Structures are given as structure tokens and as C-alpha cells.
UniProtKB/Swiss-Prot annotation:
Entry keyword annotation includes Ribosomal protein: yes
GO cellular component terms, semicolon-separated: cytosol; small ribosomal subunit
SUPFAM superfamilies: S13-like H2TH domain
Membership in a protein family: Belongs to the universal ribosomal protein uS13 family.
Any single GO BP term: translation
Pfam families xref list: Ribosomal_S13 (PF00416)
GO MF term set: rRNA binding; structural constituent of ribosome; tRNA binding
Domain of life: Bacteria
Subunit structure: Part of the 30S ribosomal subunit. Forms a loose heterodimer with protein S19. Forms two bridges to the 50S subunit in the 70S ribosome.
Protein name: Small ribosomal subunit protein uS13
């Protein structure tokens, strides 16, 4: 099993698919990495040489923000919004949808389970 960016990559999958197991690398970025390293698209991870794995590691470290660094930067961006006190920051702070979705009836995922309210009794 190859280990790239702190993630164990599955050995029997194609390199294009296996790279997507790394947080921050999707289909487009995986294709770009393969193109930069000049690996055939149909090559599987267990067929890669150590030199090719090293090249992939170097390209990812040099050109892409992945795993812990990406998570940290995303968290810092959200924290910055909350510290500014802007509308998006307030929505994050209150645990409500940030991108303008309605909250009167929906948004249960973001708001959490429904809270019981003492209403009309029969």
C-alpha cells in the first residue's frame, strides 16, 4: 500500500481513482497530477515504481493543499468570518445555513434535531 500525503492509497485501484482518497484531490486534480508525472491513465497503484510514487508525492506537496493543511485553512477561514461578525460569520456561529436557504421549514441537518415546544394540548 502506497502512502501519499499521510493517506494509505488502495493498491488494486487505478491511480486516477486512488488519488481521490486524499482529502482535497478530486477527479480534476488527480488527472492533472497523473499528467504532470506522465503516468498512463490505466496504470494501477500496485504497478507503480517507487520513483513514480515519489514523483507523485513531490507534485502533491509542491502544488496542492491537501489533508490537514486544507482542513486547517478552511477552519481558519470560517473562524475569520465569525470574528469579523459579518452575516456569514453570524450564521456559522448560530449553526444555521450560510448560503441563503430557507429555515422556516427545512434546514434540519444544519440546525440539528427538532426541539419540542410546549404547544396546544388536546
Amino acid at each position: 500500500m502506497a502512502r501519499i500525503a499521510g493517506v494509505n492509497i488502495p493498491t488494486n485501484k487505478r491511480v486516477l481513482i486512488a488519488l481521490q482518497y486524499i482529502h482535497g484531490i478530486g477527479q480534476k486534480n488527480a488527472a492533472e497530477i497523473i499528467e504532470k508525472v506522465k503516468i498512463p491513465v490505466d496504470r494501477r497503484v500496485n504497478q507503480l515504481s517507487d520513483a513514480e510514487v515519489l514523483q507523485i508525492r513531490e507534485v502533491i506537496d509542491r502544488d496542492y493543499l491537501v489533508e490537514g493543511d486544507l482542513r486547517r485553512e478552511t477552519g481558519m477561514n470560517i473562524k475569520r468570518l465569525m470574528d469579523l461578525g459579518c452575516y456569514r460569520g453570524l450564521r456559522h456561529r448560530r449553526g444555521l445555513p450560510v448560503r441563503g436557504q430557507r429555515t422556516h421549514t427545512n434546514a434540519r441537518t444544519r440546525k440539528g434535531p427538532a426541539k419540542a415546544i410546549a404547544g396546544k394540548k388536546k
